[in-house]
Amino acid sequence: MKGSPLFHGLAPEEVDLALSYFQRRLYPQGKPIFYQGDLGQALYLVASGKVRLFRTHLGGQERTLALLGPGELFGEMSLLDEGERSASAVAVEDTELLALFREDYLALIRRLPLVAHNLAALLARRLREADLELDLLSFEEARNRVAYALLKLLRQGLGPLFQIRHHELAALAGTSRETVSRVLHALAEEGVVRLGPGTVEVREAALLEEIAFGLA
């Protein structure tokens, strides 16, 4: 816990001082910590146990964002604004948290300004991670669209060997030529297709269909 990135660069006695601003909270297994849409009031540091962060979509489907253990932080945006929580948090097992409320945070950084720098560094790192995740999600979406375009051609009786250029397939899939090239090479490495000069051959039609509908 004292190795948390929030305390990076602090002397041991400064870490103890910082921890004195936190309030202890106990959550039994399965108890919600906060819900998506709640007004944020505190940052939480996991002292023991495990926490699941998840987002609920309009259809009620839950998507797990992270599983957090001792020494990890969540809810940090609430220290910077009074906006709504973007996700829900629940205790996966009996969990002890240390809560840092906004007023206590402001008092803490007056004593230990490095904590504010560490929080900014943590937010920057998470922003980079979010950007990377968006790139990965965009690639997965493009992968599905390219697979669906190939599946349509296959169902039209034009395959399994297609005479098609990357820019033509890009137009069918609604993506860029560069993205199509990346997706096709990934599918070739998986053995789903075989690539040749100006050709794409479907080798695993069943797997292609699963990819097209997001099942693989």
Curated annotation (Swiss-Prot):
Organism of this sequence: Thermus thermophilus (strain ATCC 27634 / DSM 579 / HB8)
Keyword terms of this UniProt record: cAMP, DNA-binding, Nucleotide-binding, Transcription, Transcription regulation
Phenotypic consequence of gene deletion: Decreased expression of genes downstream of the TTHB186, TTHB147 and TTHB159 genes. Decreased expression of TTHB178, TTHA0771 and TTHA0176 genes.
HTH crp-type domain location: 140-206
Complex and partners: Homodimer.
Biological role: Activates transcription. Positively regulates six promoters upstream of the TTHB186, TTHB147, TTHB178, TTHB159, TTHA0771 and TTHA0176 genes in a cAMP-dependent manner. Regulated genes include clustered regularly interspaced short palindromic repeat (CRISPR) associated (Cas) genes, and the genes encoding a putative transcriptional regulator, a protein containing the exonuclease III-like domain of DNA polymerase, a GCN5-related acetyltransferase homolog, and some T.thermophilus-specific proteins of unknown function.
Record's protein name: Cyclic AMP receptor protein
Domain of life: Bacteria
GO cellular component, one term: cytosol
